[in-house]
């Protein structure tokens, strides 16, 4: 099964959700002072959504830095986004933005830590996605 590249802030919400998937994970660094990592295989990106309800600033800066590297951008195959339903139409909007800019499918959205149903849906969805 393919690699999951993800960003999780200090809140660790995205990280804790992904640990439940029991898949290969590659975490993007928190700070801008670290070099941009390079991946060498296709991956699905998982990102939280920032910005308090608007689309400006919705994609975390470390995710933008990572995707601005052409070699990383060429290997993205899909995106999953976390968000907060309190932000209405902007819920998980980082996924919409990455999907549009990278021309990849937006596979799933979940709220904060996700539910057990979200975990099952993502596990099953990724299995189908990588074996199609």
Swiss-Prot record:
GO MF annotations in UniProt: FMN binding
One Pfam match: Flavodoxin_NdrI
SUPFAM superfamilies associated with the record: Flavoproteins (SSF52218)
Protein task: Probably involved in ribonucleotide reductase function.
Protein species of origin: Agrobacterium fabrum (strain C58 / ATCC 33970) (Agrobacterium tumefaciens (strain C58))
Gene: nrdI
Protein family membership: Belongs to the NrdI family.
InterPro entries reported for this sequence: Flavoprotein-like_sf (IPR029039), RNR_Ib_NrdI_bac (IPR020852), RNR_NrdI (IPR004465)
GO biological process, alphabetically ordered: protein modification process
Protein name stated in the entry: Protein NrdI
Secretion signal span: none
């Amino acid at each position: 099964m393919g690699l999951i590249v993800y960003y999780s802030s200090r809140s660790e919400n995205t990280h804790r959700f992904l640990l439940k998937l029991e898949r290969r994970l590659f975490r993007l660094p928190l700070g801008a002072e670290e070099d941009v990592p390079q991946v060498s295989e296709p991956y699905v990106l998982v990102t939280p959504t920032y910005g308090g309800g608007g689309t400006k600033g919705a994609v975390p800066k470390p995710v933008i830095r990572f995707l601005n590297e052409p070699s990383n951008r060429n290997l993205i195959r899909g995106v999953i986004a976390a968000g907060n339903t309190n932000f209405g139409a902007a819920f998980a909007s980082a996924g919409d933005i990455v999907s549009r800019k990278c021309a990849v499918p937006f596979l799933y959205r979940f709220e904060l830590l996700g539910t057990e149903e979200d975990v099952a849906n993502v596990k099953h969805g990724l299995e189908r996605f990588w074996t199609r």
